[in-house]
Amino acid sequence: MNIFCSPGVFRNGQVSSILGLKPNAISNFGFLARVPLQNGRFDRTEVDLRLSDLLIEAKLTESDFQRAPKATVRVYRDFNEVFDSEYLPQTESDYLSYQLIRNVLAAYASGGEFCVLTDARRPELIEDWYAVMKRALG
């Protein structure tokens, strides 16, 4: 994440190009995304970083992507439109990788994109990401 703090990191266009962004993207750390709920309200989830329309979750030191009760996750307006929920990673009572599910829904609601940055020495987190994304519809 430190690279995004460096002044002028987007100036020459190379980093922007790798991320599919226009040059001079502005970093917005701790971005409060608005994820629509079925009742018309919003969940104000914090995403680690927003660059233009790209939301980024950096998982560098935490052990997992958290879990949440199924009832909590099912209240998101676009949940059934975005995910094949039957096959998401889950236990009897909880969906696993809740942060990923919520942030994918945040990107979907804003018409943006979402990516995960993690340490290559944490293959279990990469597997968690793939387990969620292969259940995204469309």
Identify what each model region corresponds to.
Residues 4, 16, 80, 84, ...:
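Generic detector of well-ordered alpha-helical segments enriched in charged/polar residues
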Residues 60-120:
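Catalytic cores of nucleic-acid endonucleases
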Residues 9, 77, 81, 137-138:
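Accessory terminal regions of nucleic-acid processing enzymes
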Residues 24-54, 58-64, 68, 92-93:
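Active-site metal-binding core of divalent-cation-utilizing nuclease and nuclease-like domains
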Residues 1-34:
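Acidic-basic catalytic patches of nuclease active cores, encompassing PD-(D/E)XK
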Residues 13, 66, 126:
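Short acidic, gly/pro-rich beta-turn/loop elements at beta-sheet edges
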